[in-house]
Amino acid sequence: VARFKSLIEAGLLKPEAIEALSAFEPRPDFDRSLSYNALKLFTNGNYALRDQNFRLAETPSMAAWRVATAVARELERAKLYYAYITQLKIVPASPFWFNAWTRKEMFASCFTLEVEDCLSSITHPGRYCIYDALAYSGIIQQLGGGVGYDFSLLRPEGDVVRGSVGVASGPVSFMRLFDANVDVIKQGGKRRGAQMGTLHVWHPDIRKFMKAKTGELKDAPLQNFNIAVFVDDTFMEKALGVDGDSKYKLINPRVFYDKTGKKAVEFVDVHKETQVPKEAVWGELDARQLFGEIAHGAWDSG
């Protein structure tokens, strides 16, 4: 209990935690029962709190009690949860251990963030732009959470940028920003960050996206990303040659929105659910060939 009080006095835990933490009942049997590897993970993985001098400040059973009381809040329920944890019937996710009773309590492990086709809400009020997502991502990563993004709304490489009379660099270039963001944050020194990036198969930059982690590039950029391709029924039917035609149309999401007032990602199968404006069609590709490339890319980068 004295250790908990010292952590509160140091500002590492919330003052209101004192009542719940003061009811701590040590479980030395639990502390001693953990294997060497488990204790190594507990300490080196920063599941235990550390003081201002970065020294370990709690035992495994102390950490379990801290988590149990932060989650349950009501004492009897906390005792039951504590019993389950110390019996290893329940093992809470990492953010519980990192953040329970701290000033930035955040228990969720996974988040998804929208990335709209604009740089900042400063110039585009009411929209959730690239650098807005980047800022929120940094906060989530700092607290130990992982983040997923769909980059399908970003205009393709080479498309016009009317505000600057320039051309767009495409989704993959912006993904490098998010990748570097994780390296800088390092999840608050707790663990390596985790990110998922996705792109719809109809996006004109789909080949560049799926090859960003394959071949000679697989050990270079986007080391903090897993990537995945969203496919729809139309694409799979083309890939399987259902109607004898394997050609699949690519869509510029910016032009699609300009012409329809809707986001292409709102549709499960945009080709079947709406009439794609001809101006939004940015070429076509062989679905059967691309499906093979996607499968090979998954193997090559895995």
Language-model-detected regions and their locations in the chain:
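Extended catalytic cores of very large enzyme megasubunits
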Residues: 1-301
